[in-house]
Amino acid sequence: MKSVKLGGFTSITGLNVLNPERIQFTCEPSLDFTPTFYKEGDYVVAILPVDATLTAGTYNMTLVYGGSTQTLSLNVEAKDFQSSNINVSSTMLNMYRTSETISAFEKVRTELTATSSDVRYFSGSFLSSPATGATLLRGFGREIVLNGDTNNKYRNNGVDFALPSGTNILAANDGVVVYSGILDYTGCMVVVDHGFGVKTWYYNMAKTSVSVGDAVKKGDAVGTAGNTGFVAFDSTGVHIAMSVGDKFVCPYDAWDDSRDYGKIIIWGIDD
């Protein structure tokens, strides 16, 4: 039985599948996600996110293709997400964190996560830091309470880094730019599609350095550190998130300094 912590991700692979789009997937209890399978040589591959808000326990997945049925069990382990109270100005809240600015971001997020390249651009580890000298401020999954108001809180969907203004922000892995622009909520933002449903998101930058359609390599600059949009830290820097499909996930296992895998494992291919 595979195990994965809340907020993490794993992969499902198969052989002898000519039409991966015909794979039927169900899960009990629900994972609130239907994976997309992509061709990788003789294999089909799906990256499966485990949302941080799910309940720990055993999830029984059933996959049907043609006349074949396979049942897989996934052990979802609990994870203790810490909480922080952050004080931000009323100006910051009223300008950048409103129902309107969040809705505008959600619209873009929904559009971007609806599709992904069927080419796997990523390989090996993802960068654990956006630049030399970056300081990790707050990690994935932390509950952020704003100004002590428990009715105004959110779960950090990525990792916050402090960096001097203007420092180049580096792409975490190879991919293609699918968004480069500015939103009130995220500020200057770039989104890179790494293929197979995996994307990285770069918020709060001073400016972007790439355009939609640009191919980037791991370590290429996508923008510069700044503090645009809604910023819940007292410095310049960048917020970096990773998503699989429409779920934001913890990137740590894919980082080059991970104590575990250090990359996205495609079972049967990369393990």
Roles of regions detected by a PLM:
Residues 190-191, 214-270:
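Conserved, short, structured surface segments that act as functional micro-motifs
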Residues 74-186:
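Surface-exposed, glycine-biased beta-strand/turn segments
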Residues 168-178, 210-225:
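Short, well-structured beta-strand-loop connectors
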Residues 53, 66, 166-167, 181-183, ...:
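Short polar/acidic secondary-structure junctions
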Residues 1-80:
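Cationic-aromatic interfacial patches
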Residues 171-209, 235-242:
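Zn2+-dependent peptidoglycan hydrolase active-site motif and core
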Residues 154, 159-164, 197, 208, ...:
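Catalytic cores of extracellular degradative/oxidative enzymes
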Residues 63-65, 181, 194, 220, ...:
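Conserved "cap/hinge" positions at secondary-structure junctions
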